[in-house]
Regions:
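Core, highly hydrophobic multi-pass alpha-helical transmembrane subunits of bioenergetic inner membranes
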Residues: 1-419
Length: 419
């Protein structure tokens, strides 16, 4: 089926209104100059955090549904849309029980797609890993949310607070339940396995917005626990994040390589919880937007290379570079993982580094993270480009990949201008 469509004036108006509303709302990180920085309606809350995460889902959802219309079956597209709808609701829900429902329901469609659509032999092992973490934490999560709702006398997150004879350990347990979905150490083992055994479109959505659901849950319900009493866990996460970057150097599977990089990158917004105030906390989730776009871009690139060269081995991937266009896309994709200017991650990391000035531990972490985080993608980029024997080819079947990647490159590097 052809991937080229004629869009009428209706589509043009819809896209124009969405872009106009995004410009109207964002006006910088965490700022809404017409209606204030938050919009409450009891059941729903729409703030800068919701805005950036919803934008992430809409970008990934729209471009994947349009560009891969001929590659994805109707069943796959349906389950992806279901997951996106529940994720958007989760980002904007203020009610604890409904939040739990849409939080869990946003992941189940992707779990089903791993079972049903993955062509890899170990997909059942990966599915059991994912479902194990998903189901084992589901019951404790709803029980804790119900208990805190009862103690605080309200189901709405914005009316919760520390007190009311609630032990701080309850909030710590709730935080770790959410950490399993991010995932942070020691709950990280499922992510490389699931990425390696799932289809590329599922990997795009997993790294795109599923990893951010846990951070959102922590922000909504346990935002007040991140103080000096919790900094020991942050210290462990930072050390392990550097270890993930080193581990990525030994990976030959492209998807596992990127999964370990994502495990390292996701520590940055968690660090932002400790060094940011209420005004600047939006930078952590603005970083999530940049990370989601960058991860989706590189997973899409690996998908394209897999179709061209029939391998995910990083040593052999250079055979998939078929000309100047693919070479340019490779360069921009790898640089997005390095937080290269003018990516969203670059500006967020600059701000977070400035917030960490004067704190020796944070500065040491940033030195190691920025060095290895920039070096690892550049090594792969150099390997793919140096002494590469490629031939120029033009094949209509690959245009959908190139358009998808070009659109994501635009958002990775120029979203800071639009948003």
């Amino acid at each position: 089926m052809s991937m080229f469509f004629m869009f009428g004036i209706g589509w043009f108006l819809i896209v124009s209104v969405c872009l106009w509303l995004s410009l109207l709302y964002s006006c910088g990180v965490g700022c809404c100059w017409l209606v204030g920085d938050k919009v409450f309606s009891g059941l729903f809350v729409f703030d800068s955090v919701s805005f950036y995460l919803v934008i992430l889902v809409l970008i990934l959802g729209f471009y994947s549904q349009v560009m891969f219309f001929g590659l994805l079956s109707t069943q796959v597209r349906f389950f992806l849309v279901v997951s996106m709808v529940f994720a958007v609701l989760c980002f904007c829900i203020n009610h604890s029980v409904i939040f739990w429902c849409v939080y869990e329901l946003s992941m189940f469609p992707l779990l089903y797609l791993i079972f049903s659509e993955s062509p890899y032999s170990e997909r059942f092992l990966a599915s059991w890993y994912f479902s194990g973490y998903l189901l084992s934490t589901s019951l404790p999560l709803i029980l804790i949310l119900l208990y805190l709702s009862y103690v605080n006398g309200s189901f709405f997150f914005n009316e919760w607070g520390y007190g009311c004879n609630v032990s701080l350990s309850i909030f710590y347990v709730l935080s770790f339940v959410f950490f399993t979905k991010v995932p942070l150490v020691p709950f990280h083992t499922w992510l490389p396995i699931v990425h390696a055994e799932s289809t590329s479109i599922v990997s795009i959505f997993l790294s795109g917005y599923i990893m951010k659901l846990g951070l959102l849950g922590v922000y909504r319900s346990t935002f007040f626990v991140f103080d000096l009493t919790f900094v020991g866990y942050l210290f462990v996460c930072c050390l392990v994040a550097i270890g993930f970057l080193v581990t990525a150097c030994s990976e030959l599977d492209g998807k596992r390589w990127l999964a370990f990089l994502s495990l390292s990158h996701i520590v940055i917004p968690f660090l932002g919880f400790f060094v940011s105030d209420w005004i600047s906390i939006g930078y952590s989730f603005f970083y999530c937007l940049g990370h989601g776009l960058s991860a989706a871009l590189v997973f899409g690139l690996l998908w394209c290379f897999y179709d061209v060269s029939n391998t995910r081995n990083l040593v052999l991937l250079k055979s998939g570079i078929g000309g100047v266009v693919s070479m340019v896309i490779v360069v921009f994709s790898m640089l997005s993982l390095c937080s290269f200017p003018t990516t969203i991650q670059f500006f967020c990391e600059v701000y977070l580094v400035s917030q960490c000035s004067g704190l020796l531990f944070y500065l040491l972490f940033w030195v190691c993270y920025l060095f290895f985080g920039g070096l690892v993608p550049l090594i792969l980029c150099g390997h793919l480009l140096i002494r590469s024997e490629y031939y120029e080819f033009v094949c209509v079947s690959y245009h959908c990949y190139y358009f998808f990647l070009c659109f994501l490159v635009f958002w990775c590097y120029f979203a800071i201008v639009v948003l």
